[in-house]
């Protein structure tokens, strides 16, 4: 069973007027991981699709997604899959990949229907593509690692880059996840924006009672969303995107847009945040 929700894009002036319920309706993506289902959110931010697949012992096939206007989802798209659960298998284009927890798979345009099997909890990211690059499974030890932050600022972390120009080719998808060092809870702080790319976050590895306070909005008009385990949020190009957890967590970041330059950002000075 595949469920698809559509999210239209919103400008910053309209977003300023929203209350908590309105912000969550526009940007928060919960309930992506439902047993025995594929659940997708088709966003109008660079046409990024965000979703989850939980086979729970019965294979799930992702094929036609009506909002894409194509017979199969990968006819004119590429896909990244991150396994945030137990071991599972993903099959497409006549190949199969065994995915452990934390593995990331890239599937190119034209790979055909995608089958998810096993006990995995598969986080799905897809964006339009113009050509087919080779499919590739990337494990944590093969990702590019960037260490940032410090214990003194509670933001010491390792950024693991998987679908990234220095690791492999893609059309516009850039995907990785960030792991925190002991005692650090702040992500993407100091904050930044990147007007040429949207971004989506998935927060996971949270304890049941833990929460992440995700900050968004224009630097001069910040808002927050309270996030639980395995919940996602879409970040428009005009918005900051950072957060602070009540305990340890990991988050997947994914971008699509005009370029694949992870460093192409506009930093926001602390004194400019409101």
UniProtKB/Swiss-Prot annotation:
Keywords: Isomerase, Metal-binding, Zinc. It is an enzyme of class 5 (isomerase). Its EC number is 5.3.1.17. Its cofactor is Zn(2+). InterPro entries: KduI, KduI/IolB_isomerase, KduI_N, RmlC-like_jellyroll, RmlC_Cupin_sf. Disulfide bonds: none annotated. It holds the Pfam family KduI. Pathway: Glycan metabolism; pectin degradation; 2-dehydro-3-deoxy-D-gluconate from pectin: step 4/5. Binds 1 zinc ion per subunit. One of its GO terms (biological process) is D-glucuronate catabolic process. Zn(2+) binds at residues 192, 194, 199, 241. It catalyses: 5-dehydro-4-deoxy-D-glucuronate = 3-deoxy-D-glycero-2,5-hexodiulosonate. GO terms for molecular function: 4-deoxy-L-threo-5-hexosulose-uronate ketol-isomerase activity; zinc ion binding. Belongs to the KduI family. Catalyzes the isomerization of 5-dehydro-4-deoxy-D-glucuronate to 3-deoxy-D-glycero-2,5-hexodiulosonate. This is 4-deoxy-L-threo-5-hexosulose-uronate ketol-isomerase. It comes from Cereibacter sphaeroides (strain ATCC 17023 / DSM 158 / JCM 6121 / CCUG 31486 / LMG 2827 / NBRC 12203 / NCIMB 8253 / ATH 2.4.1.) (Rhodobacter sphaeroides).
